[in-house]
């Protein structure tokens, strides 16, 4: 789309917001904002511990008392109690720890899943992040300034470029069955004029800006998790999802 000056822009009721945006900024300029601000987990951290909380996945149910009884939320408006479910809590926690951060020092940053069901309308069930193998996988996430997350959620070209960067950085591409068609399209990507120069186009070619190197503190956090998982497998209550946890560990070849 040809770019228009601010004085020329006429916004009608039927105008698509993304088209209007791309009339002011090029796709390259949009992606440049992400290029210069994103925070990536180091490949060494990913290899050390690919998935941090395999007991959790999007829409999973929360339990208290060491997985022995349901954790409920009570509505102030209706007084009704409902079973509390996972939104993005443990994905956020995994990414925060893998970047050596603390939640309270992460104001206005958002966890963005790289591989998932592409649905700008937010109407489809996201089977990828409902999979225990991929929800808290640190190679499936990037930390972005919160306003920029909307670009990744609503602009397929931006999400594709993130996926190309991630698979070349980590040497891994999500192989969930529901991603077979999107992954095939990714192989045909040819919009390199908008792809950031600082991002890798091939495996191990380069690292994007914003990679947080594996530090002793990050390593220490990663090395705590296998012992916790091992203890939960042995001792957690009846609602602990043992089969799904073991399947995730087997997929990633994690030995406890």
Language-model features: where?
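Mixed-charge, low-complexity interaction segments
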Residues: 1-96, 161-163, 174-176
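Generic detector of well-ordered alpha-helical segments enriched in charged/polar residues
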Residues: 19, 31, 35, 92, ...
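Acidic, low-complexity intrinsically disordered regions
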Residues: 36, 48, 63, 105, ...
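Short, isolated positions within intrinsically disordered regulatory regions of eukaryotic proteins
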Residues: 44, 56, 71, 119, ...
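Histidine-centered catalytic micro-motifs used for acid/base chemistry in nuclease
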Residues: 84-147
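Generic recognition of cysteine residues
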Residues: 111-112, 137, 165, 174, ...
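Polybasic, low-complexity binding patches
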Residues: 151-191, 195-196
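C-terminal, well-folded lobe of enzymatic/effector domains
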Residues: 181-256
């Amino acid at each position: 789309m040809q770019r228009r000056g601010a004085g020329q822009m006429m916004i009608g009721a039927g105008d698509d917001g993304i088209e209007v945006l791309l009339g002011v900024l090029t796709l390259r300029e949009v992606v440049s904002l992400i290029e210069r601000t994103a925070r990536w987990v180091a490949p060494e951290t990913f290899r050390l511990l690919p998935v941090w909380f395999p007991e959790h996945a999007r829409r999973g149910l929360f339990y208290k008392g060491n997985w022995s009884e349901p954790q409920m939320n009570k509505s102030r408006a209706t007084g009704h109690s409902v079973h509390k479910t996972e939104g993005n809590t443990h994905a956020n926690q995994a990414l925060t720890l893998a970047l050596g951060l603390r939640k309270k020092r992460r104001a206005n940053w958002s966890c963005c899943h790289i591989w998932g069901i592409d649905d700008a309308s937010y109407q489809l069930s996201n089977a990828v992040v409902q999979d225990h193998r991929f929800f808290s996988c640190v190679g499936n996430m990037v930390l972005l300034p919160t306003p920029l997350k909307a670009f990744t959620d609503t602009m397929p070209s931006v999400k594709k470029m993130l996926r190309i960067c991630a698979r070349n950085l980590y040497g891994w591409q999500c192989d969930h069955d529901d991603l077979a068609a999107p992954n095939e399209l990714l192989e045909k990507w040819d919009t390199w004029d908008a792809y950031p120069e600082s991002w890798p186009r091939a495996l191990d070619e380069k690292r994007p800006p914003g990679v947080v190197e594996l530090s002793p503190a990050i390593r220490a956090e990663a090395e705590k998790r296998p012992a916790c998982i091992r203890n939960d497998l042995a001792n957690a209550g009846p609602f602990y999802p043992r089969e799904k946890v073991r399947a995730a560990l087997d997929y990633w070849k994690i030995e406890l």
